[in-house]
A protein has these predicted regions:
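A boundary/linker detector
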Residues: 1-53, 276-277, 281-288
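A broadly tuned preference for mixed-charge, low-complexity surface segments
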Residues: 10, 15-29, 119-132, 156-166, ...
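Generic detector of well-ordered alpha-helical segments enriched in charged/polar residues
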Residues: 37, 41, 45, 60-64, ...
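Alpha-helix initiation/capping motif
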Residues: 37-38, 46, 59, 95, ...
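Histidine-centered nuclease catalytic patch
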Residues: 49-117
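Generic surface-pattern signal
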Residues: 68, 123, 127-130, 146-155, ...
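Polybasic, low-complexity binding patches
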Residues: 88-100, 108-152
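C-terminal, charged low-complexity interaction regions
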Residues: 157-296
Length: 296
């Protein structure tokens, strides 16, 4: 692999390192994979901006796991080989659990969009839904805010008021307990067998919460099933994300969140993730930290 042209001037540290590497690895002919190419591009970009980059947490293997995404979470368009990895929460930067794959068009402006700017842009877009704000339509700003909120530490009440316009991408670490609960409940409907699990889901909740949970869960399912028809019928994950834009779903979700504090949300997520779901693997934050401590 050849570094970008601006890095090939004589005396440039990237060129010097590249030339030393070529001499040391002259006999190696194995081509770089797409994940390795992206990893090197990330390291170079972080170095050029002076950003911290955790070599232990971010590896080509981690980036390869992001490639399960087939569509940009913001535009909804199919991702190609030129898709870019960006940090969800800019303040946390290049760390595992804070990375997502997006289209090049979104990546170009993503590094200038922090949480406050995203919220402000969404408010302006909501006020003028037919007008693009900062070059993006209302539906895209809703997804930007939804995605950024998942990796941005927020007050419990604020996190609980946000609709899940984007389901959590692979490998993202959700930092707000109420959104963990929101995501786990939504994902229950994204995999087969939800009908058999519905009763045990309700039983996981305290008795005082079960009625509100059932009203919310049934509303979310009904709205997801109403999304599109025939050839326009979306995949269930996309249908669930769209269902979160429904006023009835949000109103019933807010009734649930009014009765669930952060501690109870964590307890419920722990209960709900004990049983595996087909094709879905949920790792709790505490489990990750414990494994890292054992490996240290």
């Amino acid at each position: 692999m050849v570094p970008p042209a601006p890095c090939l001037w004589p005396g440039h540290p990237i060129r010097e390192g590249w030339e030393r590497g070529r001499r040391a690895m002259a006999r190696r002919t194995r081509p770089a994979t797409l994940a390795v190419t992206r990893w090197l591009a990330l390291r170079l970009a972080a170095w050029q901006r002076g950003d911290a980059f955790d070599d232990h947490q971010i590896t080509p293997q981690v980036l390869r796991s992001l490639e399960v995404a087939t569509h940009c979470p913001i535009t909804g368009r199919a991702l190609q080989n030129d898709a870019c990895v960006v940090p969800v929460d800019l303040r946390r930067g290049w760390v595992a659990g804070n990375l997502v794959l997006v289209s090049p068009q979104i990546a170009e402006r993503w590094m200038t969009i922090d949480w406050e700017l995203a919220k402000d842009a969404l408010a302006r877009a909501e006020a003028e839904p037919e007008t693009q704000v900062e070059g993006l339509p209302l539906r895209h700003w809703r997804r930007v805010v939804a995605l950024k909120s998942l990796a941005t530490p927020l007050p419990h009440d604020e996190a609980g008021r946000l609709p899940l316009h984007v389901l959590p991408p692979n490998r993202i670490r959700l930092v707000n307990p109420i959104q963990e609960l929101q995501a786990v409940l939504t994902l229950q409907l994204a995999v087969p067998g939800w009908g058999q699990r519905a009763r045990s889901l309700a039983e996981s909740f305290p008795e005082a919460l079960r009625t509100e949970f059932n009203l919310f869960f049934n509303s979310l399912l009904a709205q997801a099933l109403r999304q599109g028809h025939g050839d326009m019928k979306p995949e269930m994950r996309d249908a669930l994300a769209a269902a979160w834009g429904n006023e009835v779903v949000m109103r019933r979700w807010l009734r649930v969140t009014a009765l669930v504090d952060a501690a109870l949300a964590e307890t419920l997520v722990e209960r709900l993730t004990r049983e595996p779901m087909p094709g879905l693997y949920v790792v709790r934050h505490g489990e990750v930290e414990a494994r890292q401590a054992l490996a240290a």
